From Swiss-Prot:
The Q motif is unique to and characteristic of the DEAD box family of RNA helicases and controls ATP binding and hydrolysis. ATP-binding RNA helicase involved in ribosome assembly. SMART domains: DEXDc, HELICc. Residues 27-37, 82-109, 172-188, 212-249, 264-280 have a biased composition (Acidic residues). Residues 59-76, 807-821 have a biased composition (Basic residues). PROSITE patterns: DEAD_ATP_HELICASE, HELICASE_ATP_BIND_1, HELICASE_CTER, Q_MOTIF. The keyword RNA-binding applies. A motif (DEAD box) lies at residues 457-460. The gene is drs1. Residues 134-162, 281-299, 765-805 have a biased composition (Basic and acidic residues). Belongs to the DEAD box helicase family. DDX27/DRS1 subfamily. It catalyses: ATP + H2O = ADP + phosphate + H(+). It is found in: Nucleus, Nucleolus. This is ATP-dependent RNA helicase drs1.
Amino acid sequence: MAPKQKDDDFVLTLSDDENDAFNNFDVDGDDGDDGDELASSGTKKRKRDTAETTQNTSKKQKQQKPVKNGLKKNKKGQAETPAEEEQEEPQEEEDAGEDDGALDSDFEFDVGGVANTVVEGFDGWGMGNAEDEGAAKKGDKKAVDIDDIISRRQAKKEAAEAKKKKKQSEAQDNESWDGVAEDEDAESDGGMSVDFQDDELLAADGFGMGADGEDESDNEEAQDESGSDNDSDDDEEKDSEDDDDEAASDNDSVATPVGHPEDEASDNDSDAESEIDAEEQEKRKAFFAPEEEKTKEQADGAQRSFQEFNLSRPILRGLAAVNFTNPTPIQRKTIPVALLGKDIVGSAVTGSGKTAAFVVPILERLLFRPRKVPTSRVAILMPTRELAVQCYNVATKLATYTDITFCQLVGGFSLREQENILKKRPDVIIATPGRFIDHMRNSASFTVDTLEILVLDEADRMLEDGFADELNEILTTIPKSRQTMLFSATMTDTVDKLIRVGLNRPVRLMVDSKKNTSLTLVQEFVRLRPGREDKRLGYLLYLCKEIYTGRVIVFFRQKREAHRVRIVFGLLGLKAAELHGSMSQEQRIKSVENFRDGKVAFLLATDLASRGLDIKGVETVINYEAPQSHEIYLHRVGRTARAGRSGRACTIAAEPDRKVVKAAVKASKAQGAKVASRVVDPAVADQWAKKAADLEEEINEVLEEEKTEKQLAQAEMQVTKGENLIKHEAEIMSRPKRTWFESEKDKRAARKLGAAQLNGPDAGLSKKEKVKLSNKDKKRLDDARQRLEGKAGWKKGKAEREAPKPAKGKGKGKDKKKGKN
């Protein structure tokens, strides 16, 4: 009886049910009575097991009344499932009789079989998960909404205007009642003479009060003529000065045309770059793996589908779910090499699918990993938070039908939640360098000893001076025996830079490695003549109000300028969002989501958004001013015309931007891309610039109100922090202090180097640092200030010092003699 009691008490799990159902199938294909008896006995046993288990649970229901109803429902469900199985099993037995346990030889993977799960319009920003939404809502700072401030101010203005109109109407009513008396007074005063020469008695909008003198009207006509001349001059290309040379030769036949010094310097630089040093070629030959000769099938692009890479079915199903059917050139080259475990240095134009090029082989390799012990094996590093969030969304979509786990270590999100996820040892970690190092040094649950694959996306940016210290800290900590993959649209192949990453005979996979743009991109340039640089905002407002009215990204060099233009757009009724490093993570994600969903028409961003950001439907990119280098320009304009779609890029360029503009035009002409010059009427631009200038006072008031709200939010946060310190003092004090690998001084120096890479060496000169002055410097500054104020005393020169001095008391003696007489 004892063994029987054990069998009765045993509760089947889901896997046990599946094994029993599988064992009930007759593998030999006999549809005899034996199979029916086995099936019936199996179902009877399950009936008995479920009945006894429900009886055992019913005894406990008397003590647990709150969960009584739920258990009754489970009991009913358990009683109904065997009956359903009895009806379905005969059909399964008939199917199993014809199956020999192997797959049909004619079976093919049906890409269209997942048509119901295809994500239409997938762009990497589909944050539909509640987990992602909850993470996005947890910002470190309290957000201050500019739209709320502007709407409040406009509501106040409208209320004040309504009140003013009401008073005026009341005054007019009172005047109408007293009209008869006023007419009589006017008749009685008919013989009096009134002097109207006083300016205060005349209305400002009276007839003739706004008329200008003849000289002023002549000046305006002259300005209009010069404006039309400037308008006609804007038709010429950015890199040519032929019309100016012809005009100079007409005026002075002796003068010869002289090229612009910046043009000559850029020509010399391009010549120097084209002639690669023989020593550098030898270095590259020794550093990179030899390039394999292309077969005829590879040259013809024979691999037209992902199925020809021999990928696993869960990966193919995930690719079909996001509507990836045909591999791009960079994917065709990268996936076979990455599956072999080789190091890779890859480059391709923006929007060519570089993220999937390294995610797909990583997922394929992880499907064959040991599953007994969870281990973190892959680290993908990104330069910006938005790019890391986007890569995380793409990777999780591609791995939908696998058991591979992911974790994103991004600044701005909760450290505690990230530590809890790291305790589960996720397979793939997608991170920014700063937060990766933070967890590496301060989280006990995070170990990097098991990493097997390292990916650096936008690697040329990661190799710059701003990220050099952080990257070196990571590379010296993780294992050296790893696979390393570097990708970027402007990937460098200079050995001195790449050797720092610790690559082992990497394979160069350069697709469109000549720093080209997409062929579907139309590049436009608006030229600002010398002396009109202060009208730049007027040109931008005209373009956004009249020409490009929707799905536009506007790039700025500085956060301050982007924020100020954001306020101008709001005051002029243009729906815009901003994206830069001074915003909290909650605000940054909200801005991208609002722009992606079409709630705002313009995204005003710094170079934070220039790399990797993939938002579907971006029609236009406007450069408020040309960037520091041609590489940054390529990344900026690469936000549009992605994946074969068309797009436009418009750059407002002045004389300081000549070098970058010329490089862009030269590369585009060599590639065969379309380049055009857009002409904007200077008078129209001046009108918009005047509108922006008239809003200057209101802009400052909005900035002041925003500053006040931020200070209030900061004060509230400090109060909350103090309350938490008092309430949870023991827990907070018991936490170990977080450490960092460099001092504050080193961090400031790295920040300066990063700013210089983006905006040039003079980027930080406008903001002066506080330096303690010596007494000598103070005296020099005081003397200079006194001279400017005119208070400095007269100082004798050499001639005055050498002149004979008058005798002492000579004048006084004469006065004394006169007094005595």
